[in-house]
């Protein structure tokens, strides 16, 4: 069966693996999923990104991060905002702050995929892909 929303699939795989305390999770590779993974890594939500396979079988292996003695997941919540049936676009002033700045919104802009903080610094808006906190 075809996957009509690969971003939601990626977020769900990360969320499920994080809740089950897995060290790593595999995500089908695409330019968008790699860009989102790089933003998550730069913001400290995931530890590492590796690629495996070739062509259509290419996958990203994401190393998840945990904190404390009981290995609490760093990623507490991931929520898809813009979806194929309802795209959500915001200008620079309309970019959301997630949990008062404790979380991030991942934005797809004309300058590439970036966090809401970077988009504000660069003065660009775009499609709000998801919230992570």
Curated annotation (Swiss-Prot):
Q: Which PROSITE patterns match?
A: RIBOSOMAL_S8
State whether it acts alone or in a complex, and with which partners, per the record: Part of the 30S ribosomal subunit. Contacts proteins S5 and S12.
Query: Would you tell me the protein name for this molecule?
Result: Small ribosomal subunit protein uS8
- Similarity field: Belongs to the universal ribosomal protein uS8 family.
> What segments bear the compositional bias annotation Basic and acidic residues?
16-26
Q: Where is this region: Disordered?
A: 1-28
**Per UniProt, which keywords does this protein have?**
Ribonucleoprotein, Ribosomal protein, RNA-binding, rRNA-binding
- Report whether Ribonucleoprotein shows up as a keyword of the record: yes
| GO BP: any one term | translation
State a single Gene Ontology molecular function.
Answer: structural constituent of ribosome
Q: Does the keyword Chloroplast apply?
A: no
Its taxonomic placement starts with: Bacteria, Bacillati, Cyanobacteriota, Cyanophyceae, Synechococcales
Query: Its biological function?
Result: One of the primary rRNA binding proteins, it binds directly to 16S rRNA central domain where it helps coordinate assembly of the platform of the 30S subunit.
Cross-referenced InterPro entries: Ribosomal_uS8, Ribosomal_uS8_CS, Ribosomal_uS8_sf
Query: In the UniProt record, which is one GO cellular component term?
Result: ribonucleoprotein complex
* Coiled coil segments of this chain: none
Query: Which species is the source of this protein?
Result: Prochlorococcus marinus (strain NATL1A)
